Amino acid sequence: DEGLSPIRLADKPGFERWIQREPLGVVFVIAPWNYPYLTAVNAIMPAILAGNSVVLKHSAQTPLCSERFHQAFQAAGLPEGVFQYLHLSHKDTEDIVRDERVDYVAFTGSVSGGAMVEHAAAGRFIGVGLELGGKDPAYVRADADISHAVEVTMDGAFFNSGQSCCGIERIYVHKSVYDAYLQQAITWVKKLKLGRPDAQDTTLGPLVRTSAADFVRKQTQEAIDQGAIAHISADDFPLDRSGTPYLAPQLLSHVDHSMRVMTEESFGPVVGIQKVRSDQEAIDLMNDSEYGLTAAIFTSDIHRGVELGQQLETGTFFINR
């Protein structure tokens, strides 16, 4: 209730002033295939709790999620029509964004998809919320707990096979701890088990589709051709096969920002590790990106970590996680 209450403003002589919070109307939620329930819930529930109706368009990769939401809301007694879902093509989705009955659009997905939504909504003067991709960086300072940094950054890079908007996609390590970090990271990655997502011993599943794996393979090979060193052998991951969504993890060193793997969203199980000489070099490289979703710094000096974090061009900043 407090979150939906009017916002009181300072009184003026003869006036009482407040900002009244009211429902927008119809909220069109466009949800992605990765974390298909969580990302959708983050948009659906605030909209409904604030008194809006919701139309959900889920990814073609995860169509049953929409239907499960509908079943759950029916079982909960939500009034008919407050939540609806549509299975749509990209063209149909654009048409819904343009429809005058839609009062707000909440989109989670790729940068190209977000650009489509923004373009389709242009001139309608409605609110549009966009949560897009990232090339999220991490920096391991000289004073960091290396074992902890390896554990957290590797998990951040390979969790969900790297298919996370907030996944760690590039890592900068101070030269004084670079070798120790790299060796521990290699050991960590080699323990991953590539397998079917329904197998109990699998710790690294397939990508969402073959074309996604092909994209990461091409990006990785291009970096190797430019001088990057690959530290993981695909031979250790028998399910890795071209023409399938199964892709072995990869750690790349001797990388730089001339390589797409360090500047373009990968959304897969590959991460580049670059040596830096100073905090300033790390900050400059972390900010050398068109993205700005999350970033992390690993250090034992929390005060210094906060100082560095304030120099980062990012929406969310973490220390030691």
Listing of model-derived features with the role each one plays in the protein:
Residues 46, 95-96, 152, 222, ...:
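Well-formed, non-transmembrane alpha-helical positions, independent of function
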Residues 7-148, 276:
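Rossmann-like NAD(P) dinucleotide-binding subdomain of oxidoreductase/dehydrogenase enzymes
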Residues 1-3:
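Long amphipathic alpha-helix in the N-terminal Rossmann-like dinucleotide-binding domain
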Residues 80, 99, 132-134, 165-166, ...:
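Short glycine-enriched loop/turn motifs at secondary-structure junctions
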Residues 104, 112-256, 280, 285, ...:
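ALDH superfamily catalytic-core signature
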Residues 61, 91, 101, 145, ...:
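Residue-level recognition of oxygen-bearing side chains
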Residues 102, 193, 239, 246-321:
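Conserved C-terminal structural/oligomerization subdomain of aldehyde/semialdehyde dehydrogenase
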Residues 53-55, 230, 316:
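A short hydrophobic/small-residue beta-strand
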